[in-house]
């Protein structure tokens, strides 16, 4: 039987504080998984990591570790891994088809500096990432949660901002991209708070050299401008 992502209940994901409150930053999608995607998930060849309530023992220092949150079909993750073969990338997403796509491409291209997790990234940050251990975090095109009553679900908010800062090395970065102007405005306002300007520097920047994701292609086709942010942890 072909499984859809909606067959997963919220109880299958780690119960972080935010989830116990019934608030999550991701949205289950009604999407089908192909046979090739399912095969990649079922045969991960040690590239797929299970969630655990202990710190991740990968990679071995001094290899820099980067976290890619919500990688979609994995195009950006693959490009980063190819560009920086001496770095390590932990890619986290909750959607099985995308996980299958990324695992399949990693196997086909024989890329070994990426590990993949199908779970809630906030739970991973809270429980598996050592404080001060990340060289950078990528969050490209997170769900904008456009309705005002859903803004509390956005991944770029104060509580999560503090969590991200605690896991980054001094000088580590958080790269965020969005195609929704109201979300971009709220990100600018959040990082401009006095308490945050003491901890973070930089902000909006010209689009860096990075892979164009499938979602970004659609946004551009529909006429939405993309805003990139690059914040450095002090």
Spans of features found by a protein language model:
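Class I SAM-dependent methyltransferase "Motif I" SAM/SAH-binding loop
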Residues: 70-74
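A short glycine-rich, Lys/Arg-flanked "PGG" loop and its adjoining helix->strand segment in the class I
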Residues: 156-170
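Conserved beta-strand signature within the Rossmann-like core of class I S-adenosyl-L-methionine
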Residues: 170-178
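Class I S-adenosyl-L-methionine
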Residues: 186-189, 193-234
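Conserved beta-strand/loop positions that form the S-adenosyl-L-methionine
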Residues: 69, 92
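Conserved SAM/SAH-binding beta-strand->alpha-helix loop
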Residues: 95
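S-adenosyl-L-methionine
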Residues: 2-65, 75-82, 103-131
């Amino acid at each position: 039987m072909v499984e859809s992502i909606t067959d997963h209940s919220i109880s299958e994901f780690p119960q972080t504080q935010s989830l116990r409150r019934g608030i999550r930053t991701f949205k289950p999608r009604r999407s089908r998984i192909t046979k090739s995607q399912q095969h990649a998930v079922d045969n991960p060849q040690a590239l797929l990591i299970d969630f655990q309530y202990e710190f991740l023992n990968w990679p071995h220092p001094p290899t820099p570790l980067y976290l890619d949150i919500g990688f979609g079909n994995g195009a950006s993750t693959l490009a980063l891994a190819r560009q920086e073969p001496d770095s390590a990338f932990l890619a986290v997403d909750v959607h099985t088809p995308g996980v299958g796509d990324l695992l399949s491409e990693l196997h086909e291209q024989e890329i070994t500096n990426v590990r993949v997790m199908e779970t809630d990234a906030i739970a991973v940050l809270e429980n598996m990432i050592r404080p001060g251990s990340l060289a950078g975090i990528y969050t490209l095109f997170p769900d904008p949660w456009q309705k005002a009553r859903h803004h509390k679900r956005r991944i770029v908010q104060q509580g999560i901002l503090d969590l991200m800062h605690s896991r980054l090395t001094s000088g580590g970065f958080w790269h965020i991209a969005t195609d929704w102007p109201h979300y971009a405005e709220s990100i600018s306002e959040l990082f401009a708070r006095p308490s945050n300007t003491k901890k973070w520097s930089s902000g909006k920047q010209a689009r860096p050299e990075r892979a164009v994701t499938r979602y970004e292609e659609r946004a551009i086709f529909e006429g939405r401008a993309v805003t990139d942010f690059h914040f450095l942890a002090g």
